[in-house]
A protein has these predicted regions:
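Residues lining the SAM
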Residues: 82-85, 109
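Conserved N-terminal segment of class I S-adenosyl-L-methionine
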Residues: 1-73, 78, 82, 95, ...
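Conserved class I S-adenosyl-L-methionine
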Residues: 107-129
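A SAM-dependent methyltransferase catalytic signature shared across enzymes that methylate proteins
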Residues: 143-158
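Short N-terminal helix/helix-N-cap motif within the alpha/beta-hydrolase-1
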Residues: 89-93, 118
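A short glycine-rich, Lys/Arg-flanked "PGG" loop and its adjoining helix->strand segment in the class I
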Residues: 92-107
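Short acidic/polar active-site loop segments enriched in Thr and Asp
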Residues: 77, 104, 153
C-alpha cells in the first residue's frame, strides 16, 4: 500500500489551472488532491484499494478499477491520474475509459523515460525501471501518440521534478570530497526531469 503521496506543487498548479468544476482522481492513493481541492471543486477519488485517510471524507472515495470505472459517460469535467498508467496492464484501454467518463479534459503524470545521455552513460538505473509494479515506459512522444489514438487533443506535455545528475555520478565514482568539488565546478550541469505532466482535452 502506497501511503506516502503528498501534494506536488507542479501537479497542484496544473489542477488549479486546467480542471473543470468537478474532477475524479483515478489512482488517488491517500486522497491528497481530492481533500486539498474539496472546497474549490466538486472532487472524488477512486483507487484499487481503500486508504485510512479516506475516513476524512468517506463519501468522496470508492474502490474501483481504472479500466472499468463505476461512473456514467461524461459524468465529470476532468480526470486526474498521477503516477498510475505505468502500473496498468493496458494503458490505452485506461485512457479510453478516461475519455468515456470525462466531459472536458484529463490531467495526469507518468515517470519520464527520456534519460539524459550523461546519466545513461553512467549506467546508473532510474528507479522506474527496477520497480516491478511498473510495466509501462513512456516518453513525451509515445505518450502524445497514445493520447491522440484514444481521442484526446494534447494541450501541454511537459517535464517536471528536476533532479541534478551530478550527485548520482559522484556517488557512483566514490570520489574524495575535494575531487567531488572540483568535478562539480567543471562538469556539465545536466538535470534529469523525472516526470511527464500532461494535459489533454477531450476530442
Amino acid at each position: 500500500m502506497w501511503t506516502g503521496r503528498q501534494l506536488n506543487p507542479h501537479r497542484a498548479a496544473a489542477v488549479a489551472t486546467y480542471s473543470g468544476d468537478s474532477f475524479l482522481d483515478i489512482g488517488c492513493g491517500n486522497g491528497q488532491y481530492v481533500l486539498h481541492f474539496k472546497d474549490k471543486f466538486e472532487t472524488a477519488g477512486v483507487d484499487i484499494q481503500e486508504y485510512p485517510q479516506w475516513a476524512e471524507a468517506p463519501k468522496k472515495f470508492q474502490v474501483g478499477d481504472a479500466a472499468r470505472l463505476p461512473y456514467d459517460d461524461a459524468s465529470v469535467d476532468t480526470i486526474l491520474s498521477f503516477e498510475t498508467l505505468e502500473h496498468v496492464p493496458n494503458p490505452k484501454a485506461v485512457l479510453e475509459e478516461f475519455h468515456r467518463v470525462c466531459r472536458k479534459n484529463i490531467i495526469f503524470s507518468v515517470p519520464n523515460c527520456e534519460v539524459p545521455s550523461s546519466l545513461a552513460a553512467s549506467r546508473l538505473t532510474f528507479f522506474h525501471y527496477t520497480d516491478r509494479s511498473h510495466v509501462n515506459f513512456f516518453t513525451r512522444d509515445s505518450l502524445t501518440e497514445m493520447l491522440v489514438e484514444t481521442g484526446f487533443r494534447p494541450q501541454d506535455v511537459g517535464l517536471i521534478n528536476a533532479c541534478p545528475t551530478q550527485p548520482f555520478l559522484n556517488e557512483l565514482l566514490a570520489l574524495p570530497s575535494f575531487l567531488t568539488r572540483l568535478v562539480g565546478k567543471f562538469a556539465k550541469k545536466d538535470v534529469f526531469r523525472m516526470t511527464i505532466l500532461a494535459v489533454a482535452s477531450k476530442g
